């Protein structure tokens, strides 16, 4: 099992991100605040290494709900390191073997994998239980089957990511007593990273 150079060596643990930027060639999970302490939007993110600090621009892959009760897949450029709504950033895998940044986020790499994850049509029975979290977890299965992410237990990964988010929110609330994240949350306060290559 390979680990990323400079990563802590303790398996099955999350560790604070070092510095104020992400690492190139990695796939991250990003949770953003939705206005409730235990409710987050779940997103995949690949940072663009050409823009510094790394993480201030990159491609996010996620689903969003629309006004008519349906869901749709979106791919968009985002800044996660300075976003006031980011609660947790968790490293999932080194995806540099897929090529450079444009290759990784392009039409022949991660994009078709994410697009293959089923989204229930508006008005169907499955739409009531569907969320960005359930889509994210289904996408982890696809990424695992395609040998992009090594994850033997998706539910354990979900618990670990949620733990990071709860820890970040608790730490923030203890420090300020406010009911929502401030606009200047620092990356080392709110973020955790996971060793890649560790079966979960």
Can you describe what each PLM-predicted range is?
Residues 2-130:
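Non-catalytic ligand/cofactor/substrate-binding and regulatory segments of enzyme domains
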Residues 115-200:
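Activation targets extended, charge/polar-rich intrinsically disordered C-terminal tails
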